[in-house]
Amino acid sequence: MKLADCICQMYESMKKKFLVLTILMCTFTTTLLNGCGKKQNATPDNETLQDTETVTDQTVLEEQADSVEEGISYTWQDITVTLPQEWEDSYEIVEGNEGFSIYQKSSYDKNQGLGFLCGFTHIGEFRKGALGETLIAYADDGSCYYWIEPTDLAYDENDASSQKEYEEMAEMVPQIVATVKISGDGVHTNADEYVLPLSDKKPLTSEMLDNLNDNELMIARNEIYARHGRTFQNEYLQSYFNKCSWYQGTTMPEEFDESVFSAMEKDNLSMLEAKEEAYESEHPYPKKYEYGTVIEEDLNADGNVEQIFCSLMEQKDGSYVPIVTINGRAFDISKDCQLISPVTDCFYVTDITAADGELELAFLDYGPSYDPETYFFRFDGDMEFVGSVDGFPFKDQNDGINGFVNDGQVIGRIRTDLLETAYLNGYWLLNEETHALEYQEQEEYDYISTTAHQLYEKLPVRVTMDENAPEVVMQKQAEVYFLKSDLKEWILVKGKDGTKGYMQVKNGKVVELGKSANNVFSDLNYFD
């Protein structure tokens, strides 16, 4: 059994929240994980800070690793990590056939399975979607490197002291990941810039694609084109690939010659296209309909098809209200849905969650100053307001991005003016009891589309959203991008050279430099 598979079994046992059962399952899992494994001690390392401008992906990773504070170095085969110095005497490292795991010692000593903090593994194949598993590097021979994190409790809940220490150590795990160095031949450390990093080197299988959603399949297919320098008319795709350190867009779509593809790339494209078609067939909603036409859908899962007619009625104040007629009965939804500048040619029928079997009617409004919003209603003998989502989460309205890829959730957009005006992904969850959409707060949010900014000078950034976290220095360069934000004071910045880290912003100033953002970055966008 593979290292990661064993760890995932341990996670599932932890989810049950019962300590005795957790201990039993973790003991069994640890036995499988370790096999002929052995405990290892790390040794102190006193490497100096590096500051170069080399832009190869392996060198960038090493520079970032070297920039992290001194600590305790540990090497397993070709993987080296640095643990925080304050962890001395508090951790246990256990090796397996395909990697190693790091534990909190006090929990591990009680039971070999508790105290799991993270693991690193090197396997001979690519896989996508395993629980708690993140690809950090891949090699030309097709092998892949992963780091693995717990997805739930991994300590003795009845020991307050052990729990406190575990939580403090867990907060520092991202710092360990930032120190990873891999010395293997042909290793590429920009794996996070790909959906399928080996699609130009290895044949894809259907199993590799099983856990990919609609958006990931679209990006994976276009990755094959992007590797050959194709540009994109789709704004989202162009923005997405511009952020990748490996991408150089040189060929316009109309000039691109597909003869540059290898036979394997062509086969992989066919595989991805077939998977996209299968996904669409398995997920028929949302469906787009024109106003003023009679449609038939079973809205309330009673086995009977409703006849639905929707139109728009203009009000005296210039706003619009959708008029919904179901089975000959007209419903007034004006209390919950006043459209300022509606999308007039269509509405949608959606299926936010398959669990309830119900469908929703969705109406789109551009708002007073292009602030798009989507209103959802359900039918249960009467029309009930489900809620609204900022943005239009429909592929044909949203640069091909599907906002319904997670069952029970709608992905819209939210606005930030933290450093500049920008839009990020927002998430709304359907409450199964109240049938209402509820906005979900996140620790950080992904920018939807970003433009390149010139970085005028060296910029110190942090490996986590913590002003005391280890520091990485970004070199001044022509292209940097904003990737994520907590919407409060932190923005994840990435350079075209591959370096990245969190920048703290307060009152329009970059904290680490004490300068106005306009004096650090070019072309910041501001609008009402």
Mark where each language-model region is.
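Acidic carboxylate motifs that coordinate Ca2+ or other divalent cations, activating on Asp/Glu
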Residues: D302
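Secretory pathway targeting signatures of secreted, lumenal, and periplasmic proteins
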Residues: T82-A130, L135-I136
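SH3/SH3-like beta-barrel superfamily modules
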Residues: V472-F527
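Surface-exposed amphipathic alpha-helical segments
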Residues: T151-H188
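N-terminal, intrinsically disordered, polar/charged segments of Gram-positive cell-envelope systems
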Residues: K38-Y74, V187-V195, E280-E297
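Amphipathic alpha-helical packing elements
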Residues: M208-Y247
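Short aromatic loop motif centered on NTY/YTY
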Residues: D345-R378, M383-A452, E457
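Sec-dependent N-terminal signal peptides of Gram-positive bacterial secreted proteins and lipoproteins
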Residues: M14-N41
